[in-house]
């Protein structure tokens, strides 16, 4: 099971990282964008027992980026 999660996680990262980074950069600028995207992927890794890689994963990723960006901007 763990090997399967790692393979799926790597594929997810390769598929979505560039687009998420572009989106985050548009929201918060280059300085904070990479940190936000990495935070989202770290959170997925930490919650691997409860994460489901279904049809809604793309929406989940982009919504997570948006939420983290808004929270960051609120606290600046």
Where are these regions (language model features)?
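Short, charged helix-capping/linker segments at alpha-helix termini
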Residues: 2-10, 21-39, 49-52
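Hydrophobic/aromatic residues within well-ordered alpha-helical segments
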Residues: 12-16, 20, 65
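Structural recognition of an alpha-helix C-terminal capping motif at a helix-to-coil junction
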Residues: 22, 35-42, 55-67
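Arg/Lys-rich amphipathic alpha helix in sigma70-family domain 2
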Residues: 52, 66-76
């Amino acid at each position: 099971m763990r090997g399967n999660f790692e393979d799926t996680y790597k594929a997810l990262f390769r598929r979505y990282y560039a687009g998420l980074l572009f989106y985050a950069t548009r929201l918060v600028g280059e300085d904070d964008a990479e940190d936000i995207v990495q935070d989202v992927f770290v959170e997925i890794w930490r919650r691997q027992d409860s994460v489901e890689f279904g049809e809604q994963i793309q929406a989940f990723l982009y919504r997570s980026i948006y939420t983290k960006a808004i929270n960051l901007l609120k606290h600046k």
